[in-house]
Amino acid sequence: MEPSTAARAWALFWLLPPLLGAVCASGPRTLVLLDNLNVRETHSLFFRSLKDRGFELTFKTADDPSLSLIKYGEFLYDNLIIFSPSVEDFGGNINVETISAFIDGGGSVLVAASSDIGDPLRELGSECGIEFDEEKTAVIDHHNYDISDLGQHTLIVADTENLLKAPTIVGKSSLNPILFRGVGMVADPDNPLVLDILTGSSTSYSFFPDKPITQYPHAVGKNTLLIAGLQARNNARVIFSGSLDFFSDSFFNSAVQKAAPGSQRYSQTGNYELAVALSRWVFKEEGVLRVGPVSHHRVGETAPPNAYTVTDLVEYSIVIQQLSNGKWVPFDGDDIQLEFVRIDPFVRTFLKKKGGKYSVQFKLPDVYGVFQFKVDYNRLGYTHLYSSTQVSVRPLQHTQYERFIPSAYPYYASAFSMMLGLFIFSIVFLHMKEKEKSD
């Protein structure tokens, strides 16, 4: 080998580990679609919070002809952020169908709209059970608007009481009022997967702010959604915000006070804390569960048998972990149930936490067949947790039955009494002589 070639080989040898380490250390790949690149500056605090948590952000305009989510059947990104409400046509090979396929593949999507909403976002919302109001409409509330509103009462002050009662999604800390300006949404009542994360007050409605009301508004009162979410059956997560301004630096740092006399003034909104909590949930930093080792055996044994016997006393245990700050830690829950199912559950009982795992002892039913130990945990804000272990339950062997059954003692007594009676009758009958008749 020539000296120059050897030197290059040694240089590559020493540089390869750092390069591989940098690749392995890169965070979740996230594509950010913007109306224009100025949004990077006006929403810098939100994007900085993502970068500080290790996200690898790729900024592009929504009409960039080089856009691509899927290449050769593989997803190029883990997450998608759409901060381009007015887009009419996505660039490259991205469209509503590819975004839907991205969600079907388990991808996470964060969408922010505005009153200038275009057809693609409206169509994407319909695919997820969300219906946006018409273009140029806005959420209006004549009783809960900010003191800095310009007169159309579209700068809404949303109370935290209207937030979804799910700390995993909206955060655990108490928040200041939320500042919102944007388009309203309604949820498809036939879609049970839609989450009403932030609703309007009972006095809010969605309509054209510069026109008199001539027809019933699209959304009225508590049915008006300001922020909505979706967790699909494959645990993919999507969040729709009717306001792009909700994520802006100006709304994060703004003071907030309702225009009603005597209203309390807050030096800062709760937008930043809520936006961070929502991003942690939608990008699966919070509320992610997984199943660890599962074991089952007869009480007093350590290994599972080839088949259980009816009425056996068994012990079942399962390890459930939760993702927290990038690490898997034991999950803490008191409402996890175990079902012992054939076609319908024969046993349903709560699992108790013991030594880092959940376990329970119970007696098998006096029914044989093919059963399943099943844990099906589906709670608001958490990924769907499912574990199923199939086992066989056989009847008692001939030598395992009791020789005498206590409940049959009366029948035993009747049989032996009949035998004894027959024996006595036979003796009497055989040895009794009839008296001879005298003349």
Curated annotation (Swiss-Prot):
Record's function text: Subunit of the oligosaccharyl transferase (OST) complex that catalyzes the initial transfer of a defined glycan (Glc(3)Man(9)GlcNAc(2) in eukaryotes) from the lipid carrier dolichol-pyrophosphate to an asparagine residue within an Asn-X-Ser/Thr consensus motif in nascent polypeptide chains, the first step in protein N-glycosylation. N-glycosylation occurs cotranslationally and the complex associates with the Sec61 complex at the channel-forming translocon complex that mediates protein translocation across the endoplasmic reticulum (ER). All subunits are required for a maximal enzyme activity.
Signal peptide extent: 1-26
The organism of origin for this protein: Pongo abelii (Sumatran orangutan)
Origin superkingdom: Eukaryota
Lineage of origin: Eukaryota, Metazoa, Chordata, Craniata, Vertebrata
Family matches, as PANTHER family: DOLICHYL-DIPHOSPHOOLIGOSACCHARIDE--PROTEIN GLYCOSYLTRANSFERASE 48 KDA SUBUNIT (PTHR10830:SF0)
Lumenal domain ranges by topology: 27-410
Database matches in InterPro entries: DDOST_48_kDa_subunit, OST48_MD, OST48_N
Statement: the UniProt record of this protein carries the keyword Transmembrane helix: yes
Subcellular locations according to the entry: Endoplasmic reticulum membrane
Pathway listed: Protein modification; protein glycosylation
Keywords assigned: Endoplasmic reticulum, Membrane, Signal, Transmembrane, Transmembrane helix
GO CC terms: oligosaccharyltransferase complex
Protein name as it appears in the record: Dolichyl-diphosphooligosaccharide--protein glycosyltransferase 48 kDa subunit
Family note: Belongs to the DDOST 48 kDa subunit family.
Pfam family, one: OST48_N
Entry membrane topology: Single-pass type I membrane protein
Main localisation: endoplasmic reticulum
Cytoplasmic side: 431-439
Oligomer and partners: Component of the oligosaccharyltransferase (OST) complex. OST exists in two different complex forms which contain common core subunits RPN1, RPN2, OST48, OST4, DAD1 and TMEM258, either STT3A or STT3B as catalytic subunits, and form-specific accessory subunits. STT3A complex assembly occurs through the formation of 3 subcomplexes. Subcomplex 1 contains RPN1 and TMEM258, subcomplex 2 contains the STT3A-specific subunits STT3A, DC2/OSTC, and KCP2 as well as the core subunit OST4, and subcomplex 3 contains RPN2, DAD1, and OST48.
Spans through the membrane: 411-430
GO biological process: protein glycosylation; protein N-linked glycosylation via asparagine
